[in-house]
Design a protein with these regions (language model features):
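Beta-rich, blade/repeat-based domains predominating
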Residues: 1, 33-50, 84-99, 131-140
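Acidic, glycine-rich loop-and-beta core segments that form the ion-binding/anion-interacting portion
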Residues: 1-30
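Conserved beta-strand positions in repeat-built beta-propeller and related beta-rich domains
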Residues: 4-8, 55-58, 102-105
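A short beta-strand motif characteristic of beta-propeller blades
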Residues: 27-35, 76-82, 123-128
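C-terminal hydrophobic structural anchor segments
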Residues: 64-113
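Short loop/turn segments immediately following beta-strands, especially the blade-tip
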Residues: 15-23, 66-73, 114-121
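A detector of repeated loop/turn-to-beta-strand junctions in beta-rich toroidal repeat architectures
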Residues: 9-11, 60-62, 75, 107-109, ...
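Blade-level signature of beta-propeller repeat domains, shared across WD40, Kelch, NHL, RCC1
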Residues: 105-114, 123-140
Length: 140
């Protein structure tokens, strides 16, 4: 299974991979907005345990939490939260995966969320850390 975020139509696609043929098959396509909203996909990350996928929407300034079905890899929306900035270009999970840091390209700030390891849900901790024109977030 692979998870793909599409920038121009702000969708997340769930793909299965056939190792024999070297091909992908689209299993699902999830819109991150309604048709009348302008949106651009940003970043996407899968937790190490494979239980949650997180995606950002740069046009709608939001983060999406999806749970992963362990049997087929399909996604279910768990939560949508405001990213508390403009154009959440990138985000990253901390090494212990207890936190997510979001970098905003237009509002020049980082947002810090605490992540519930059981439910995947995010809680805002800080939204006003100055960081000019962020395009990538890499934890140490």
């Amino acid at each position: 299974i692979a998870y793909l975020i599409c920038e121009l139509d702000a969708t997340v696609e769930v793909l299965s991979y056939d190792k024999e043929n070297g091909t992908f098959t689209n299993l699902d396509k999830i819109a991150l907005t309604t048709e009348d909203q302008q949106a651009w996909g940003g970043a996407i990350h899968l937790t190490r345990d494979g239980r949650f996928v997180y995606a950002s929407n740069r046009g709608f300034d939001a983060l999406y939490t999806f749970s992963v079905d362990a049997t087929n890899g399909l996604l279910t929306l768990v939560q949508t939260v405001d990213s508390y900035g403009s154009v959440p270009r990138d985000f990253h999970l901390s090494n212990d995966e207890a936190y997510i840091v979001v970098g905003h390209q237009e509002s020049d700030n980082l947002t810090l969320f605490k992540r519930d390891l059981e439910t995947g849900q995010l809680t805002l901790l800080q939204k006003d850390f100055y960081a000019p024109e962020v395009v990538c977030v890499v934890p140490q």
